[in-house]
Swiss-Prot record:
<keyword id="KW-0648">Protein biosynthesis</keyword>
<keyword id="KW-0547">Nucleotide-binding</keyword>
<keyword id="KW-0436">Ligase</keyword>
<dbReference type="InterPro" id="IPR000120">
    <property type="entry name" value="Amidase"/>
</dbReference>
<comment type="subunit">
    <text>Heterotrimer of A, B and C subunits.</text>
</comment>
<dbReference type="GO" id="GO:0030956">
    <property type="term" value="C:glutamyl-tRNA(Gln) amidotransferase complex"/>
</dbReference>
<keyword id="KW-0067">ATP-binding</keyword>
<protein>
    <recommendedName>
        <fullName>Glutamyl-tRNA(Gln) amidotransferase subunit A</fullName>
        <ecNumber>6.3.5.7</ecNumber>
    </recommendedName>
</protein>
<feature type="active site" description="Charge relay system">
    <location>
        <position position="154"/>
    </location>
</feature>
<dbReference type="GO" id="GO:0005524">
    <property type="term" value="F:ATP binding"/>
</dbReference>
<dbReference type="Pfam" id="PF01425">
    <property type="entry name" value="Amidase"/>
</dbReference>
<dbReference type="InterPro" id="IPR020556">
    <property type="entry name" value="Amidase_CS"/>
</dbReference>
<dbReference type="InterPro" id="IPR023631">
    <property type="entry name" value="Amidase_dom"/>
</dbReference>
<feature type="active site" description="Charge relay system">
    <location>
        <position position="79"/>
    </location>
</feature>
<dbReference type="GO" id="GO:0006412">
    <property type="term" value="P:translation"/>
</dbReference>
<dbReference type="InterPro" id="IPR036928">
    <property type="entry name" value="AS_sf"/>
</dbReference>
<comment type="function">
    <text>Allows the formation of correctly charged Gln-tRNA(Gln) through the transamidation of misacylated Glu-tRNA(Gln) in organisms which lack glutaminyl-tRNA synthetase. The reaction takes place in the presence of glutamine and ATP through an activated gamma-phospho-Glu-tRNA(Gln).</text>
</comment>
Length: 492
């Protein structure tokens, strides 16, 4: 079959279990596509064909023996922030160019245990700091919908790989929108779970109180399959929560859109910089949900103006602490011929970290410094609590909250956005991480340049099943999630 890459996860699972094709055939199909198409997209940092085919053969044996899981033999790609035993894990940084992890991240361990096949590691913004995937030391990834545009970030490689049909689904991480914004830019579905729902063990840390892993795929159904594998408590992660895990696939039709109350924050739709096409597509998608029986309720989120300053104090402060471990001594990049220990520290960090990472370390170090700690960091933590309370108050009246995932569609690679402009582009996504809430992006159409637009739905704590179910039903009544970029239509 030449069009295996067009099948959904459910169709792939059925095809494998009915022996219509083998995991080896499926894996070889994707490896061929990567070899042919990825030189244009540049989504993969490392492709692992030998390991992938070994895992595919093991999956075929398990399928024959009748001891397979629901997903045995299906390939996937991992964001290059997840530690993978024996495979390079760079986090998009020169600092970790030579780092081969001695262990697997829990998410990777779980995908292996489920019989999924690892195709390789995909590109990202350096240490997940960015919204374009341009800050990676290996260079920018292209958006499959327009190769001279960015795929978003930081999980841009994950989004581009799925959108170009170079992987059926992928793992991502989201610290301030890094799953939802690239999913929006690339026309995909991406879920950021509640903080503590998916283990962070083995994820290279950016901001530990904000980071969360999740699935990126074409549809809510595909995301649900991956969530069934990766969600759950992990004793190795102290922030992981002991809470029963839903069967996300079984629950896909369990939330009725009829009677659902969707909150429309008036502050969100009056943000300066909200593109007219984005606003129009999001409003059309809400009208569709209204036709399906949902009620649209205008709400106030009065803390909206505080999102960006609060996030860009807390996240860099945590980053400056987390990234202090990269000093050129134990692992990672080490400068040549240091004059003394201080020179080793200074030069290893100056040469190993890119400009955006250095910028955030400086902001964070400043915010945590003795004279400014109370004025900046402590104050930001207090405002963070107010942002959380703002959402909880809204959820007393509504079931979910709707917003664009990003104020614009994808920008051109190399567009000279200054850092503050880039930070303001995160306005719709960062509050979700500050509050620890779950949120999902769904593709809802295109702008005048045929670039994808995304609708974001924000849920109350632990409502991943509800969010996936709402988007699944929306996707049964629309076909935006089935649209493919021209490059994805190419055969290997």
């Amino acid at each position: 079959m030449t069009d295996l890459h067009r099948l959904s996860i459910r169709e792939l699972a059925e095809g494998l279990s009915q022996a219509k094709f083998s995991s080896r055939e499926l894996t070889e199909h994707y490896l061929k596509r990567i070899a042919k198409i990825d030189p244009q997209v540049k989504s993969y940092v490392t492709v692992t064909p030998e390991q992938a085919l070994r895992e595919a053969d093991a999956a075929d044996a398990a399928l024959k023996a009748g001891n397979a899981t629901a997903l045995t033999g299906i390939p996937l790609a991992h964001k290059d922030i997840f530690c993978t035993k024996g495979i390079k894990t760079t986090a998009g940084s020169k600092m970790l160019d030579n780092f081969i992890s001695p262990y697997d991240a829990t998410v990777v361990e779980k995908t292996k245990a489920a019989g999924l096949v690892t195709l390789g590691k995909v590109n990202m913004d350096e240490f997940a700091m960015g919204s374009t995937s341009e800050s990676s030391y290996v260079g920018a990834t292209s958006n499959p919908w327009a190769l001279d545009h960015v795929p978003g970030g930081s999980s841009g490689g994950s989004a581009a790989a799925v959108a170009a049909d170079l992987a059926p689904f992928a793992t991502g991480t989201d610290t301030g929108g890094s799953i939802r914004q690239p999913a929006s830019f690339c026309g995909l579905t991406g879920l950021k779970p509640t903080y503590g729902r998916v283990s962070r063990f083995g994820i290279i840390a950016y901001a530990s109180s904000l980071d969360q892993a999740g699935p990126m795929a074409r549809s809510a159904e595909d995301c649900a399959y991956l969530m069934n594998v990766i969600a759950g408590h992990d004793a190795k992660d102290s922030t992981s929560v002991k809470k029963e895990v839903d069967d996300y696939v079984a629950n896909l039709n369990n939330t009725s859109v009829k009677g659902l109350r969707i909150g429309i924050p008036k502050q969100y739709f009056n943000v300066a910089g909200l593109d007219a096409d984005v606003k129009a597509r999001v409003e059309e998608s809400l009208k569709k949900l209204e036709e399906m029986g949902a009620a649209l309720v205008e709400i106030d989120l009065n803390m909206t103006e505080a999102y960006v300053p609060t996030y860009y104090l807390i996240a860099p402060a945590e980053a400056s602490s987390n990234l202090s471990r990269y000093d050129g001594v134990r692992y990672g990049y080490r400068c040549e011929n240091p004059a003394d220990l201080m020179d080793l520290y200074k030069r290893s960090r100056s040469e190993g970290f890119g400009p955006e990472v250095q910028r955030r370390i400086l902001i964070g170090t400043y915010a945590l410094s003795a004279g400014y700690y109370d004025a900046y960091y402590v104050k930001a933590q207090k405002v963070r609590r107010l942002i959380q309370q703002d959402f909880l108050k809204a959820f007393e009246n509504v079931d979910v909250i709707a917003a664009p995932a990003a104020p614009t569609t994808a920008y051109k690679i190399g567009a000279s956005l200054d850092p503050v402009e880039m930070y303001l582009g995160d306005i719709y996504t960062i509050a979700v991480n500050l509050a620890g809430l779950p949120a999902i992006n769904a593709p809802v159409g295109f702008d005048k340049d045929n670039l994808p637009v995304g609708l974001q739905l924000i849920g109350n704590y632990w409502s991943e099943s509800q969010l996936l179910s709402i988007v699944h039903q929306y996707q049964q009544n629309t076909d935006w999630h089935t649209k493919r970029a021209a490059i994805a239509e190419e055969n290997a």
